[in-house]
C-alpha cells in the first residue's frame, strides 16, 4: 500500500525505471518499519525508534538480579553457622562417649556371661575367665604395632612403637562355662611370630585371665581381605576365626597383667577416640564470620570488594 501511494505523488517526467526504483525503496522501508521498528523518511537515514521505557526496564531487571544475588550469597554464612553449631553438638556427644568408654574400661571385671547375646552390650567391658589355652590353633592379626597401655592412655592413642609385628589370637577353653573363646594374648614382633621362637611364653595349664570384650570388626577401605589359608588376618572377623578354630565367636583382649615372660605383650586394646571437632568448630565459625563481613560490606555498606 505504501508503494502505491508513493507512485501517486511521483512527478510525471520521471522515467518508468525511476518509478520502479522509487517504489522498490518505499516498499523496502515499509517492511523494515513494520518488522524492526525503523522509521523511514524520504532523504533521511533510517534510524531505530527509541523506547522511553527501556531504561526503566533495565534498571528494574538489574535491581531484581542484585536482590536475588544478595539473598543467595547470604546462604554461605548461614550454612557455615549451621555446620559449626552441628559440630558443637557432635563434640558434646563425642566427649560423653569417651567418658562412657573410660568408665567402662576402668570398671571391675565381671564373669563372662554364658549367653553370647549379652556381649553385644558389653564391648570394652572387662570380664574374667578361667581355663587353658590351645596353642596349636594360634591365629595372627597383622601387621600391628605394640602399644604401651600406660603411654597409650597418656598420649591419647599415639603409637608407642613403630616396630611391626602381629597380635597372637589363641583359643581358650573356659572350664567354668564349658565353651571355647578367642583370646588376643597381645603383641609379638615379626621375628617372634613363629611360636617355636617363644616357647617360654606359651602358658600351660589353667590360668585366670582378665580381658576386654571386643566385637567383630568390619573391613576398612584399603585393608586386604583375610587369608585363612595362610593364617593371615588383617581385621577381626569373629565368625571366620571361630569356624577355623572351632571356638565360639567370643573375643577378648587379654590385659597387660596377663603377659607371660617371653610371650605376647598384653593390653593392646585402644579405647581412645579421635576428637577433632574443635578444629571443625573453629573452621566453620571462622568461615561464617568472614563471609558475613564480606556480605555486609557488599550489600549493606555498598563497598566495592576487590
From Swiss-Prot:
Disruption phenotype: Results in smaller animals with mild decreased motor skills, enhanced working spatial and recognition memory, and increased longevity. Increases global and regional cerebral blood flow. Increases lactate levels in blood and brain, and increases glucose consumption in the brain. Increases hydrogen peroxide production and succinate dehydrogenase (SDH) activity, but decreases COX activity and respiration. In the brain, increases Hif1a and phosphorylated cyclic AMP response element-binding protein levels. In the brain, increases resistance to calcium-related excitotoxic brain damage. This is Surfeit locus protein 1. Keywords: Membrane, Mitochondrion, Transmembrane, Transmembrane helix. The keyword Ribosomal protein does not apply. It is a multi-pass membrane protein. The chain crosses the membrane at residues 68-86, 280-300. Its main location: mitochondrion. PROSITE patterns: SURF1. Component of the MITRAC (mitochondrial translation regulation assembly intermediate of cytochrome c oxidase complex) complex, the core components of this complex being COA3/MITRAC12 and COX14. Interacts with COA3. Belongs to the SURF1 family. One of its GO terms (cellular component) is mitochondrion. Disulfide bonds: none annotated. GO terms for molecular function: cytochrome-c oxidase activity. InterPro entries: Surf1/Shy1, Surf1/Surf4. It is found in: Mitochondrion membrane. PANTHER family: SURFEIT LOCUS PROTEIN, SURFEIT LOCUS PROTEIN 1. It comes from the Eukaryota. GO terms for biological process: mitochondrial cytochrome c oxidase assembly. Component of the MITRAC (mitochondrial translation regulation assembly intermediate of cytochrome c oxidase complex) complex. Regulates cytochrome c oxidase assembly.
Amino acid at each position: 500500500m505504501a508503494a502505491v501511494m508513493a507512485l501517486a505523488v511521483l512527478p510525471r517526467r520521471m522515467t518508468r525505471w525511476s518509478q520502479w526504483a522509487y517504489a522498490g525503496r518505499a516498499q523496502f522501508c515499509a517492511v523494515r518499519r513494520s518488522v524492526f521498528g525503523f522509521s523511514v523518511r524520504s532523504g533521511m537515514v533510517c534510524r531505530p525508534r527509541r523506547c522511553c521505557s527501556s531504561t526503566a526496564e533495565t534498571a528494574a531487571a538489574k535491581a531484581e538480579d542484585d536482590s536475588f544475588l544478595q539473598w543467595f550469597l547470604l546462604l554461605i554464612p548461614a550454612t557455615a553457622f549451621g555446620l559449626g553449631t552441628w559440630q558443637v553438638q557432635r563434640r558434646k556427644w563425642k566427649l560423653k562417649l569417651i567418658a562412657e568408654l573410660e568408665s567402662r574400661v576402668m570398671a571391675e571385671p565381671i564373669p563372662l556371661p554364658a549367653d553370647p547375646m549379652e556381649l553385644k552390650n558389653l564391648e570394652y567391658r572387662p570380664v574374667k575367665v578361667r581355663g587353658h589355652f590351645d596353642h596349636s590353633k594360634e591365629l595372627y592379626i597383622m601387621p600391628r604395632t605394640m602399644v604401651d597401655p600406660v603411654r597409650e592412655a597418656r598420649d591419647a592413642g599415639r603409637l608407642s612403637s613403630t616396630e611391626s609385628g602381629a597380635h597372637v589370637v589363641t583359643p581358650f577353653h573356659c572350664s567354668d562355662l564349658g565353651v571355647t573363646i578367642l583370646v588376643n594374648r597381645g603383641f609379638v614382633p615379626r621375628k617372634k611370630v613363629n611360636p617355636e621362637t617363644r616357647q617360654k611364653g606359651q602358658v600351660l595349664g589353667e590360668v585366670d585371665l582378665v580381658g576386654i570384650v571386643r566385637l567383630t570388626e568390619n573391613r576398612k577401605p584399603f585393608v586386604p581381605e583375610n587369608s585363612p589359608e595362610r593364617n593371615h588376618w588383617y581385621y577381626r572377623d569373629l565368625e571366620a576365626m571361630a569356624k577355623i578354630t572351632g571356638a565360639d565367636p567370643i573375643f577378648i583382649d587379654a590385659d597387660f597383667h596377663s603377659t607371660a615372660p617371653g610371650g605376647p605383650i598384653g593390653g593392646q586394646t585402644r579405647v581412645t577416640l579421635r576428637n577433632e571437632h574443635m578444629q571443625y568448630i573453629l573452621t566453620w565459625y571462622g568461615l561464617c564470620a568472614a563471609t558475613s563481613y564480606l556480605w555486609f560490606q557488599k550489600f549493606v555498606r555498598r563497598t566495592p570488594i576487590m
